[in-house]
Amino acid sequence: MPEFSVPTQLPDWIKDHVALYLESEGKEGHMWDSSIAGGSGSLATLLLATTGRRSGDSRTVPLIYGEVDGNYVVVASRGGSKDHPDWYKNLTANPDVSVRVATNVFDAVARTAEGDEREALWQKMSDIFPPYNAYQERTDRQIPVVVLDPVTA
């Protein structure tokens, strides 16, 4: 499974968020001020570690999440850009991921929700972070909703 690390290729505010999350072992960084991205307050975030599809290196990104039936749900919005985020491309190539939610760390298998499940999860996630709706309006691609199914021993 991929390991967590501070990303080098992302903006400084994301690097700082991940560094705080990791250095505090999840005691800080879990709640994030979403106003920087158009939100209206603090939102819970997780860290997702994927394996780079070309490099094979671990890649870590913080993401807003929701919980449904013991699984975690994230949105591959990339702010509504025309391309999917790299982390999503990575997990479609290798769905085995590592997840940190506050102080809880676990392995999971990522899958893209489809059909009715996607619609229900999209509604839940856009209720948590309403800017997702604006992101969807500004792109021609359907923004993926990803379910992180924890691996049980």
Label the model's feature ranges:
Residues 1-38:
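Extreme N-terminal tail/first-helix region
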Residues 4-8, 77-132, 138-142, 150-152:
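Short, structured beta-strand-loop surface elements
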Residues 33-36, 136-140:
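Short coil/turn segments at secondary-structure boundaries
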Residues 39, 66-67, 138-139:
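Extracellular/periplasmic catalytic domains that process cell-envelope and extracellular macromolecules
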Residues 42-79:
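Short beta-strand segments
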Residues 46, 144-146:
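Short beta-strand micro-motifs in enzyme catalytic cores
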